[in-house]
């Protein structure tokens, strides 16, 4: 499948350069040559090989936005935006994209932004090199969108903290070598009492309770974790004590932008699949793309993909400029996730019986897309944020 690129694409782009365009092509080629041929196998195995992190690191993809002195490529967040969109556009699958994306997009950025030089050396550098896998631990069995309700406790002791509690729905949780984990460090402190600690897999009391079975994202590992008297040294405190909630909120903006970019990439790919199939599949003596009903479906897919891209790139431009982007990011996340589900569903319909089979990958795209309106903040939470932004 050749991903659709229209002649008006550059007119609405954020500050992309020829270097970013070249990066798109490099990522797209890597995914098509080294990932797509194995996706079905990895989906069945319920994980992709750990060596994929090493290969991505070798190509520089795990450190695109990090400085060269830490082993990164010295790029910027636009490079990371290209990475998120093109993984999906080239067909990496939601599982592969989420596993690599959780490592580069949500788990390591807090370590870079708020970590000490020592933490950079112990955690960020080996993560960039693909030697240590990172995960972010916020969600708990009783606390999802309501972050302030987390109950995992980090009790202050001499020289550090003792952590007790649990986390769930943790992407990379089964294989993560370290977990950037939100804990309560002040009893009854609400959002004011949250801190971030870096928990390491080998710490006694750190347990992977189960590898969770999911509707989609089959090739990524998702875990429930348990912590029983886990002793965490003080040097693993990330940022200031009791200021973790603000770190979470800052990280959420970028996570939601990455989710929007991934959905934009997925819709680009689905549009290409639909166009290709409609041009080749014949019914009643002519390609089905000649029928108005099919043409209109594909036209709507194109509109949704373009609207999603415009909203997302607008939010990205403002985010890069350091502006207040809460409303823009929320709109982009809300629209693209729901639109991607609708686009994938229409693609299944256009392909008919073949859409229901695994050969074309659109049934997987539908299963993968369905997490979008839930993860990173549900649609309902996004609407609540927008309502408040409107003064309601």
Model feature map: region roles:
Residues 160, 164-208:
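A short core secondary-structure module
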Residues 96-118, 144:
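N-terminal glycine-rich flavin-associated loop
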Residues 100, 127, 142-145, 169-172, ...:
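Short Gly/Pro-enriched turn/cap motifs at secondary-structure boundaries
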Residues 130-138:
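A short, Trp-centered hydrophobic/proline-enriched beta-strand micro-motif
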Residues 149, 202-233:
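Flexible, small-/acidic-enriched active-site or ligand-binding loops
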Residues 229-247:
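Long, acidic (Asp/Glu-rich), low-complexity accessory segments flanking structured domains
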């Amino acid at each position: 499948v050749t991903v659709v690129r229209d002649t008006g694409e550059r007119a609405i782009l954020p500050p992309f350069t020829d270097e970013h365009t070249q990066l798109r092509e490099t990522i797209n080629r890597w995914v098509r040559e080294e990932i797509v041929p194995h996706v079905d196998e990895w989906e069945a195995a319920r994980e992709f090989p750990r060596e994929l992190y090493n290969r991505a690191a070798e190509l520089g993809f795990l450190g695109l936005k990090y400085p060269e002195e830490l082993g990164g490529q010295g790029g910027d967040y636009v490079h990371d935006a290209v990475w998120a969109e093109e993984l999906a556009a080239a067909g990496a699958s939601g599982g592969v994209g989420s596993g690599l994306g959780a490592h580069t997009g949500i788990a390591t950025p807090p370590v870079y932004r708020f970590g000490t030089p020592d933490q950079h050396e112990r955690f960020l550098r080996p993560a960039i090199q693909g030697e240590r896998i990172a995960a972010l631990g916020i969600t708990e069995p009783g606390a999802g969108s309501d972050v302030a309700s987390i109950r995992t406790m980090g009790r202050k002791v001499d020289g550090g903290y003792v952590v007790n509690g649990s986390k769930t729905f943790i992407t990379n949780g089964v294989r993560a070598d370290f977990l950037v984990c939100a804990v309560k460090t002040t009893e009854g402190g609400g959002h004011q009492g949250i801190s971030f600690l870096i928990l390491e897999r080998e710490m006694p009391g750190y347990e992977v309770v189960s590898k969770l079975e999911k509707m989609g994202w089959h090739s990524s590992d998702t875990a429930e974790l348990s912590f029983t008297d886990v002793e965490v040294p003080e040097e693993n405190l990330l940022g200031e004590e009791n200021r973790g909630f603000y770190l979470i909120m800052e990280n959420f903006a970028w996570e939601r932008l990455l989710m929007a970019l991934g959905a934009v990439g997925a819709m680009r790919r689905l549009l290409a699949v639909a166009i290709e199939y409609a041009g080749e599949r014949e019914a009643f003596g002519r390609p089905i793309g000649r029928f108005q009903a099919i043409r209109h479906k594909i036209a709507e897919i194109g509109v949704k993909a373009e609207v999603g891209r415009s909203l997302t790139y607008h939010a990205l431009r403002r985010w890069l400029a350091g502006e207040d982007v809460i409303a823009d990011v929320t709109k982009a996340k809300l629209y693209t996730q729901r639109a991607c589900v609708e686009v994938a569903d229409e693609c299944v319909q256009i392909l008919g019986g073949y859409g229901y089979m695994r050969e074309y990958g659109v049934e997987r795209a539908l299963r993968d897309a369905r997490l979008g309106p839930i993860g990173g903040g549900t649609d309902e939470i996004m609407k609540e944020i927008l309502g408040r932004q409107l003064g309601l």
